[in-house]
Amino acid sequence: MFERSRFTIDQIDPEVFAAIQQENQRQEDHIELIASENYTSPAVMAAQGSQLTNKYAEGYPGKRYYGGCEYVDIVEQLAIDRVKQLFGAEAANVQPNSGSQANQGVYFAVLKPGDTIMGMSLAEGGHLTHGMALNMSGKWFNVVSYGLNAQEDIDYDALEKLAQEKKPKLIIAGASAFALRIDFERIGKVAKSIGAYFMVDMAHYAGLIAAGVYPNPVPHADFVTTTTHKSLRGPRGGVILMKAEHEKAINSSIFPGIQGGPLMHVIAGKAVAFKEALTPEFKAYQQQVVKNAAVLAETLIARGLRIVSGRTESHVMLVDLRAKNITGKEAERILGEAHLTVNKNAIPNDPEKPFVTSGIRVGSPAMTTRGFKEEEARIVGNLIADVLDNPHDAANIAAVREQVSALTKRFPVYG
């Protein structure tokens, strides 16, 4: 028997407990600006830490390979129903353990090794699972990539021409570092014109889409994949939305195709997050995410920094650092010393190596969860610029860190 009072982390494993406490403090003390990170609610975390972690449930609700699944069936069905309602989807699979596995599930369902796929170039803002050479998608399939035009928007004309020429079996839309709105309807029409499947990976934009502040790809795509964290503010995991005609193929692709027993405690966290996302408060939050990102971009531009594409229409932006004579790697480290957490990121046609880069990626979801609004977004933009204007001055870094501390104390993550 486990006596709850005796089996606490601090008693069983002081080393892990100490690391968790230190990470808790880091999250409170630093302003999180990594666009793919966010803070989940205590309710989501409680679901993930529940006894559902003990239950094996291979299969799907009402059709399991194990007994005793009557309650996890309820949880999974709630997650399915809620995510369908959230995005207006005909069918959904909530079992993928990650966004990458959600993408892999679609590939396994409709492609064979050697088929041609077409996705956005990683070097111009795409994602590694859309055909990067070292990724499974790049090793198993023939990959053709589309990119940006001179205005650093997606070159839709070139995309259409390439699709007509190469006739891919699957066209992929979605990005990991692209700030503008994606015309899913237009790409969907291109796919339809050549008889290709159309998949949208909306992982980075899902929260905005759920709230109606970014275009919804669901009406235009055969498959829509997403993570459940990032802007959606749920647990780390994945989901596939699809047309009803593809539901059987996708379900078979996930189980038994690429996964075994689903993580029921994580699916519970997904269900809770989807319920949160259906509220008016979540819509207001996403509206603020977009407002904060716009102010952040405007502030950085006013301070002499170049934003790739010239603006943001979402939650994310790429900052070109070449004019400051500092690499993304160095900027990430120095901003981190000031308690401003960003990630280095390649910019289009980046001359630096992928682990060095000429840019940083900055996003507003996590700081908005803290309660930051336009005033705080402007302060954060100026603090970033203050660091980058004088990155090797220890006194400057310390002064910025003090201002960050004042902000984080006013806006705790978990009150």
UniProtKB/Swiss-Prot annotation:
Pathway: One-carbon metabolism; tetrahydrofolate interconversion; Amino-acid biosynthesis; glycine biosynthesis; glycine from L-serine: step 1/1. The record marks H229 as: Plays an important role in substrate specificity. Belongs to the SHMT family. It catalyses: (6R)-5,10-methylene-5,6,7,8-tetrahydrofolate + glycine + H2O = (6S)-5,6,7,8-tetrahydrofolate + L-serine. Its EC number is 2.1.2.1. SUPFAM superfamilies: PLP-dependent transferases (SSF53383). Its main location: cytoplasm. This is Serine hydroxymethyltransferase. Homodimer. CDD domains: SHMT. Catalyzes the reversible interconversion of serine and glycine with tetrahydrofolate (THF) serving as the one-carbon carrier. This reaction serves as the major source of one-carbon groups required for the biosynthesis of purines, thymidylate, methionine, and other important biomolecules. Also exhibits THF-independent aldolase activity toward beta-hydroxyamino acids, producing glycine and aldehydes, via a retro-aldol mechanism. It is found in: Cytoplasm. GO terms for biological process: glycine biosynthetic process from serine; tetrahydrofolate interconversion. GO terms for cellular component: cytosol. InterPro entries: PyrdxlP-dep_Trfase, PyrdxlP-dep_Trfase_major, PyrdxlP-dep_Trfase_small, Ser_HO-MeTrfase, Ser_HO-MeTrfase-like, Ser_HO-MeTrfase_PLP_BS, SHMT-like_dom. Keywords: Amino-acid biosynthesis, Cytoplasm, One-carbon metabolism, Pyridoxal phosphate, Transferase. (6S)-5,6,7,8-tetrahydrofolate binds at L122, G126, H127, L128. Its cofactor is pyridoxal 5'-phosphate. HAMAP family: SHMT. GO terms for molecular function: glycine hydroxymethyltransferase activity; pyridoxal phosphate binding. The modification N6-(pyridoxal phosphate)lysine is found at K230. Pfam families: SHMT.
